Swiss-Prot record:
A Gly-cisPro motif from one monomer fits into the active site of the other monomer to allow specific chiral rejection of L-amino acids. Homodimer. It catalyses: glycyl-tRNA(Ala) + H2O = tRNA(Ala) + glycine + H(+); a D-aminoacyl-tRNA + H2O = a tRNA + a D-alpha-amino acid + H(+). An aminoacyl-tRNA editing enzyme that deacylates mischarged D-aminoacyl-tRNAs. Also deacylates mischarged glycyl-tRNA(Ala), protecting cells against glycine mischarging by AlaRS. Acts via tRNA-based rather than protein-based catalysis; rejects L-amino acids rather than detecting D-amino acids in the active site. By recycling D-aminoacyl-tRNA to D-amino acids and free tRNA molecules, this enzyme counteracts the toxicity associated with the formation of D-aminoacyl-tRNA entities in vivo and helps enforce protein L-homochirality. It is found in: Cytoplasm. It comes from the Bacteria. This is D-aminoacyl-tRNA deacylase. The keyword Lyase does not apply. GO terms for biological process: D-amino acid catabolic process. InterPro entries: Daa-tRNA_deacyls_DTD (IPR003732), DTD-like_sf (IPR023509). Belongs to the DTD family. It comes from Acidovorax sp. (strain JS42).
Length: 154
């Protein structure tokens, strides 16, 4: 499973002009299920995402996670948006191939699972809409953008 994390001051996602998800300071997480992924990859990606220390402490060092933005236990927002294009293979020619992305039904099942698990352990979760044409608006903080990948077995 692939995640592209962006530390944001704020972010929102719109579908057909309607805001369907919005957060203040926190993480925008673009996520993609790959062929062979299961709940195990989703669990590992979420655990890493929530514990990753990419928010600054008082000294300006990246020592805080989205679960503790201020050192007092204040959680940041988590905006989760599905994006199958993260699995693009651009090695051949000029048109990307997306054959490594999970089939739509599997991708949606794992996305829904990922969101449910996030909501079970994090108080501020917003989402996009799976397979929708979305417009994502964000104010990057830093900018800090990190790719994460939990490889499928085999």
């Amino acid at each position: 499973m692939i995640g592209l994390l962006q530390r944001v001051r704020e972010a929102r996602v719109e579908v057909a002009g309607e805001i369907v998800g919005r957060i203040g300071p926190g993480l925008l997480a673009l996520v993609c299920a790959e062929q062979g992924d299961s709940e195990a990859q989703a669990d590992k990606l979420l655990a890493k995402m929530l514990k990753l220390r990419i928010f600054s402490d008082e000294a300006g060092k990246m020592n805080r996670s989205v679960q503790d933005l201020d050192g007092q236990g204040t959680c940041g927002g988590l905006l989760i948006v599905s994006q199958f294009t993260l699995a693009a293979d651009t090695r051949g020619g000029n048109r990307p191939s997306f054959t490594q992305a999970a089939p739509p039904a599997q991708g949606e099942r794992l996305y829904d699972y990922f969101v449910a698990q996030a909501r079970a352990v994090h108080p501020m979760v917003a989402t996009g809409r799976f397979a929708a044409d979305m417009q994502v608006h964000l104010v990057n903080d830093g900018p800090v953008t990190l790719p994460l990948r939990i490889a499928p077995p085999g």
